[in-house]
Amino acid sequence: MKVTKGLQISAVVTASVLLAAACSSSKKTASTTPSSAAPAATTSAAAAPTSAAAAPTTAAPATSAGAPAAGGGLIGVDYPRSDSDFWNAYIRYIPQMATTLGATIKTTASGNDITKLNANADSLVAEGAKALVLAPQDTAGIIPELAKLASKNIPVVTIDTEPDSGKVFMIVRADNKAYGTKSCNYIGTQLKGVGNVVEFEGDLASVNGRDRSTAFGACMSANFPKIKVFAEPTKWDTPTAIGQLNTVLAGNKIQGLYMQASIYLSATLADLSSKGLLKPAGTAGHIVMVSNDGVKAEFTAIQAGSLDATIDQPADLYAKYGLYYAQQALAGKTFSLGPTDHNSNIVTAADGDLEDQLPASLVTIDGAYPGSVKSTDPSLWGNQSG
């Protein structure tokens, strides 16, 4: 596989590229404008929380989150951003899952601003939160706050990202390397191993961007060496991605496109359409495209023949198991490496923390591709969220 970055040939994966996105080894993972922080809100579930267990117990594999857990106490939840369908779905699921699990929560919103996130965490603790569910977009900037929370014995569950350092009770995220590998195998198979493919990389300073990019590049090199990849770092910024796509198209015909997040979808389809390059699947000149997230707009594009596939990032399960693990932390439970009872696998993250890697399905128009799910499957959260 030949790889081009910004039209200059280079290795697909350099030694500095390790991964995360949604979306992490240093700076912020997005360059979008922060949204306004929402005031704290408290939600009391119908089932009253019970007292935390006095002595820690071991729970491995993880027990089901379908019923209220034993850990009582207020759980603080910060919403990281509201500039994508995915995160807006996560925000909607949190109070629903709190009710299901019998958790009492107080929420804040940090708008992709690490300073605001750290302040929100302090505020939530001051207002009585005994555990926190956070989704730090700046995985280096959260380190001092994690140290402060640890000194106060406040357990933290992080969603979607791994902090660069610092102790957390559990990381809840999907297997982002699988995103890159599944996307690679689908595109490579559809192209029969030959062609030019543009890759919209996320932010390589984020663990999600690194994981997806590393896995996609490794898979292409190993399995489809005749495919030339134009790996374009976008920092999760759509205008940057479209500019890079146009640069590639100025001197090349492309047969495939991998978008590491759904934020690129609408603008990409519009740009290709304006150039007469948006052809329906199954027709001559169609560009095989795979996205990542699992939002409704992707399923609609798949059914229209514009998009070929996406990887379903489980917004509903992020909310469910984020709260579940916060409850278990308050109950004094601990967890071990290995498979869980909810079709995931607990692994050791880079800094030694435990990470529950939730499954993420490949979604296609009819589910005929091996291992894929039909885009109209009602079990997909994107088909439930409106």
Where are the language model's segments positioned?
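Bacterial N-terminal signal peptides that target proteins for export
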Residues: 1-13
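Hinge/beta->alpha junction and helix N-cap segments in small-molecule ligand-binding domains
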Residues: 78-92, 106-116, 137-138, 161, ...
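Short, well-structured alpha-helical segments in soluble
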Residues: 116-129, 239-253
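Flexible loop/hinge segments that line or gate small-molecule binding clefts
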Residues: 140-178, 196, 295-303, 307-308
